[in-house]
Regions:
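A residue-level detector for the "anchor" residue at the start of short, highly conserved motifs
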Residues: 1-183
Length: 183
């Protein structure tokens, strides 16, 4: 399933798991889960509300990083690297045989330069607000903000002064269908 720039989509998988897909996202999933695991592949950003099944763990694969859950809610973003933010429950991030457990209100980020998964405590709201039609930015670089806005509104952004990309901003915006409604 491929969601284009400026789009969003939600679906319920065969096991009852609900998935919200953000703009420029691809989700590969089977029509029906067979075997001992429920496995999907993700590129982009998705929010998962995973149906509990202790006998059949749910796995999200992104390259050689796997997030494993038994029933929980989390956001996964692969636009720039692999980032998982846990809302409720417990998940593990696995890469190259290394496993890191996340607790609610924690973010795990795979750092390919170090081959490590880094964990930090976060406010989950800015990471999941997109699912409810909002953008929330907290001390975020203008470059990162414009990346998100360009994915949603299908914009191409050019900077005459590249130093502006590093300016940090905070604020809340509603996600409108037309960028003109922002101004």
């Amino acid at each position: 399933l491929l969601v284009p720039r400026g789009g969003e989509f939600s679906l319920t998988l065969a096991d009852g798991t609900c998935v919200w897909l953000n703009a420029e996202t691809e989700l590969l999933y089977p029509v029906r889960f067979n075997g001992k695991q429920r496995v999907v592949q993700l590129e982009g950003e998705a929010y998962f509300k995973v149906a509990k099944n202790q006998d059949m763990p749910f796995l999200v694969q992104v390259g050689d990083v796997t997030v494993k859950v038994y029933g929980t809610e989390f956001n996964m973003n692969t636009y720039d690297g692999v980032e998982t933010v846990l809302v409720t429950g417990t998940v593990s991030m696995n890469q190259g045989g290394r496993e890191v457990m996340l607790k609610p209100n924690q973010k795990g980020v795979f750092d390919p330069s170090k081959g490590e998964i880094l964990v930090e405590n976060v406010n989950v709201l800015p990471y999941v607000a997109w699912k409810n039609g909002d953008f929330i930015f907290q001390n975020e670089s203008l470059g990162s903000i414009m990346d998100k806005l360009s994915r949603w509104y299908g914009l191409e952004v050019f900077y005459q002064n590249s130093e502006l990309c590093n300016v940090r901003l905070s604020g809340n915006l509603k996600r409108y269908k037309d960028v003109k409604e922002l101004f």
